[in-house]
Amino acid sequence: MKSRAAVAFAPGKPLEIVEIDVAPPKKGEVLIKVTHTGVCHTDAFTLSGDDPEGVFPVVLGHEGAGVVVEVGEGVTSVKPGDHVIPLYTAECGECEFCRSGKTNLCVAVRETQGKGLMPDGTTRFSYNGQPLYHYMGCSTFSEYTVVAEVSLAKINPEANHEHVCLLGCGVTTGIGAVHNTAKVQPGDSVAVFGLGAIGLAVVQGARQAKAGRIIAIDTNPKKFDLARRFGATDCINPNDYDKPIKDVLLDINKWGIDHTFECIGNVNVMRAALESAHRGWGQSVIIGVAVAGQEISTRPFQLVTGRVWKGSAFGGVKGRSQLPGMVEDAMKGDIDLEPFVTHTMSLDEINDAFDLMHEGKSIRTVIRY
C-alpha cells in the first residue's frame, strides 16, 4: 500500500516528504495507521549521524499512537480497530530478560531492530523500488507502519492520541525512572539535570512520589515555569553561578541530594550529577544518551563512599503489560500530558519541528496525520 512518510535519506539532511510503499505484515507483525507522533531528541540524534546504529535511508519516529489496520499470521493480542502505542522496547514475555522479572529490556527483536530491520531480517518499506530501513522497531514518521506484535501496547480506545503518544518514549522514560529505577520515597530530595520532555517528566514523577525538594536545573530559564507547574520547588540556571553546579547543590545540603537524574546525555553532567548525590546512599540515574564512543569517569572514592550510578531505559516500564495502565492514569489526570505538547504540526512541517527542538523553543511537537 502507499503511505506518506518523512524519510531521512542521509545523515544531517532535512527529511523529505515522499510517498513510499508499505508491504503487508508478515507472521507476528501488525500494520497500523499512525494518527500522531512526537518528534524526539533521539530522532534528531540518529539524523545527525552520531548514532552508531543509525542506518540510511530510514523512516524515523518512535513516539507514536495509532490504530491497527491488519494483522499477520499468528497475531492474537491485537485485532483491526484496536488502538495501540508502538514500543521501541519490546516485551515478548518469553526471553531470559522478560522471565527474570528484573528488567524491562527484552531481546526478542533487539538484534534485527538495531539493524533497521523486521524480525525476519527484511524491511516492509520501499521507495522507488529501493528498500528503506525501519527505526527502533516503530517508524512512526510514516502514516502507515509495520510493527512486531511484541512491540505493541494495546490501549484504551478513548485515549487522546495527541497526548498519549508521548507515553511511547519521553514521558514514560522520565516518570518510570523515578518510580522503577530510583524508587524515590516521600520526603526524598531530587535534582533533575536537563528540562526537556524527559527531565520535566522526572519532575512530575518526583511530585507523584511526594519528594520533599525537587530541584530543576537547566541553562534555559524559559523552561522553569513549566518545571514549577509539574512540581519543582527550586529552579537553578548553572550560568547564574561562578562555581560548578555540584557545589551549588552541596550548598543546599552539604552531604548532597538523595536522587539525581541526568536527562541530557552529556558525560560531564553525568559526573556532576553523581558527585552531587548524597554521601552514603545517594544515587544518580543516567537517562540521557551520550554520543557514541564517549565514556564516563569519576574518582572511585565517590562510589566507595556510598553513591550509586544507575542507568534507565524507557523508565524500567514493561511496555505491553504496564504502559496501558499509564494511559489510564493519564486519562484520569494522574499523569499530566497536555503541557508537554507545545506545538502541533502536519507531516509537511516536520523539519520545522526539528528546528524548534534544536532552538530550545519546544518541549514536544506532535505531528498529526
Swiss-Prot record:
CDD domains per UniProt: alcohol_DH_class_III (cd08300)
Coiled coil: none
Cofactors, names only: Zn(2+)
Binding site for Zn(2+) 2: 92, 95, 98, 106
Gene Ontology MF: a single term: S-(hydroxymethyl)glutathione dehydrogenase [NAD(P)+] activity
Cysteines joined through disulfide linkages: none
Class of enzymatic activity (EC top level): oxidoreductase
A GO CC term attached to the entry: cytoplasm
PROSITE patterns: ADH_ZINC
Superkingdom of the organism of origin: Bacteria
Pfam families noted in UniProt: ADH_N, ADH_zinc_N
Single Gene Ontology BP annotation: formaldehyde catabolic process
Secretion signal span: none
Co-factor binding details: Binds 2 Zn(2+) ions per subunit.
Catalyses which reaction(s): S-(hydroxymethyl)glutathione + NADP(+) = S-formylglutathione + NADPH + H(+); S-(hydroxymethyl)glutathione + NAD(+) = S-formylglutathione + NADH + H(+); a primary alcohol + NAD(+) = an aldehyde + NADH + H(+); a secondary alcohol + NAD(+) = a ketone + NADH + H(+)
Keywords assigned: Cytoplasm, Metal-binding, NAD, Oxidoreductase, Zinc
Subcellular location: Cytoplasm
Protein function: Has high formaldehyde dehydrogenase activity in the presence of glutathione and catalyzes the oxidation of normal alcohols in a reaction that is not GSH-dependent. In addition, hemithiolacetals other than those formed from GSH, including omega-thiol fatty acids, also are substrates. Also acts as a S-nitroso-glutathione reductase by catalyzing the NADH-dependent reduction of S-nitrosoglutathione.
Subunit structure: Homodimer.
Identification of the protein by name: S-(hydroxymethyl)glutathione dehydrogenase
Organism, as annotated: Escherichia coli (strain K12)
Lineage: Bacteria, Pseudomonadati, Pseudomonadota, Gammaproteobacteria, Enterobacterales
